[in-house]
Amino acid sequence: MTLERSDVEKIAHLASLGLNEDDLPQTTAALNSILGLVDQMQAVNTDGIEPLAHPLEASQRLRADVVTESNNREAYQSIAPAVENGLYLVPKVID
């Protein structure tokens, strides 16, 4: 899969990225290079290979899952400017 200049412009627009005209050729080449690497990895035969969760066979000593702090929800919400049904109300940011 290769991307054209128009594809990169559309992706940049959808991601709200501001790309200069001078940056488009370099960005297109970089994205095509990444996609080429992904294509190479997808071409590798992985039949019979068990998925790997972690490269090292090590286990971690974990602490006990115990509640260590008290519930201060009401105290925190009592000083909030706007709360409804236990949720903080905030101004709308995105139109």
UniProtKB/Swiss-Prot annotation:
The keyword Lipid biosynthesis appears for this protein: no
MF annotations from Gene Ontology: asparaginyl-tRNA synthase (glutamine-hydrolyzing) activity; ATP binding; glutaminyl-tRNA synthase (glutamine-hydrolyzing) activity
Family: Belongs to the GatC family.
Classification via InterPro entries: Asp/Glu-ADT_sf_sub_c (IPR036113), GatC (IPR003837)
Biological role: Allows the formation of correctly charged Asn-tRNA(Asn) or Gln-tRNA(Gln) through the transamidation of misacylated Asp-tRNA(Asn) or Glu-tRNA(Gln) in organisms which lack either or both of asparaginyl-tRNA or glutaminyl-tRNA synthetases. The reaction takes place in the presence of glutamine and ATP through an activated phospho-Asp-tRNA(Asn) or phospho-Glu-tRNA(Gln).
Keyword Ligase on entry: yes
Listed EC numbers: 6.3.5.-
Designated name of the protein: Aspartyl/glutamyl-tRNA(Asn/Gln) amidotransferase subunit C
Classification via Gene3D superfamilies: Glu-tRNAGln amidotransferase C subunit, N-terminal domain (1.10.20.60)
Catalytic function, reaction form: L-glutamyl-tRNA(Gln) + L-glutamine + ATP + H2O = L-glutaminyl-tRNA(Gln) + L-glutamate + ADP + phosphate + H(+); L-aspartyl-tRNA(Asn) + L-glutamine + ATP + H2O = L-asparaginyl-tRNA(Asn) + L-glutamate + ADP + phosphate + 2 H(+)
Lineage: superkingdom: Bacteria
One Pfam family hit: GatC
Assembly information from the UniProt record: Heterotrimer of A, B and C subunits.
Species this chain originates from: Pseudomonas fluorescens (strain SBW25)
Keywords of the record: ATP-binding, Ligase, Nucleotide-binding, Protein biosynthesis
GO-annotated biological processes: glutaminyl-tRNAGln biosynthesis via transamidation; regulation of translational fidelity; translation
